[in-house]
């Protein structure tokens, strides 16, 4: 994919959330970076490439719903990722994640990996300290009852909760955002991810088709409807 297409893909799929971190006064900025497919089987490769965008975008939506969190400027992250020549499904090591986090004024970066082995889904999220470059925590869906691809949204939600517990325990005491009380069928989430993928490639028509399919499965899907507004201007 050309670099300009990579930048567009990241601009529609990568978001920033913020939250207070233990031992730190006030809110801390957290940069959510691309996730890497570390070896998935059982579906078209296009779907796995799309999930590399859809998973961090969905994680960001989950984290941004908390009252103690704030959104930082998304464009700074896009520029930082582009300066590192990182695209969707890029492998982001701890040093690179820390460097990007510092560039965008974040205290922490969140990146990770996923793997789908014929329906058994594993999602790992890493918290990287911007100053030291160290991986502070790795969280995952290690509950054997929650490793089925059919429960992908709940898997992402579980990892988001674990990340939040590490970076912002106070946010968990602030109540449950409306977004966390919803459910997103895996088919809708997959179609949304494909919409992000095609939008990033500059194919607005195909992106619109996939966003339409996501909304057909789940009419109350704000992220997919926002995607439709972006690609169709309505």
Please provide the spans of the model-predicted regions.
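Short beta-strand->alpha-helix linker/helix-N-cap micro-motif
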Residues: 25-94, 109-116, 136-138, 177-181
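Catalytic-center loop of serine/cysteine hydrolases
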Residues: 78-80, 84-185
């Amino acid at each position: 994919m050309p670099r300009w297409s990579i930048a567009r893909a990241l601009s529609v799929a990568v978001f920033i959330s913020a939250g207070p971190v233990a031992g730190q006064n006030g809110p801390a900025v957290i940069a959510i970076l691309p996730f890497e497919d570390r070896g998935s089987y059982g579906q078209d490769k296009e779907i796995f490439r799309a999930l590399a965008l859809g998973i961090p975008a969905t994680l960001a939506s989950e984290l941004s719903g908390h009252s103690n969190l704030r959104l930082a400027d998304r464009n700074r992250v896009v520029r930082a990722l582009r300066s590192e020549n990182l695209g969707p499904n890029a492998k982001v090591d701890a040093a690179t994640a820390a460097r990007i986090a510092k560039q965008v004024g974040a205290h922490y970066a969140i990146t990770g990996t996923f793997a789908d082995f014929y329906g058994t889904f594993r999602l790992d999220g890493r918290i990287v300290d911007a100053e030291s470059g160290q991986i502070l925590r790795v969280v995952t869906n290690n509950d054997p009852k929650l490793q089925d691809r059919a429960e992908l949204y709940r898997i992402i939600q579980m990892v988001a909760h674990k990340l939040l517990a590490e970076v912002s325990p106070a946010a968990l005491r602030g109540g449950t955002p409306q977004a966390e009380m919803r459910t997103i069928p895996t088919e809708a989430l997959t179609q949304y991810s494909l919409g992000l993928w095609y939008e990033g490639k500059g194919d607005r028509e195909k992106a619109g088709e996939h966003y339409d399919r996501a909304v057909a499965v789940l009419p109350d899907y704000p992220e997919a409807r926002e995607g439709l507004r972006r690609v169709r201007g309505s």
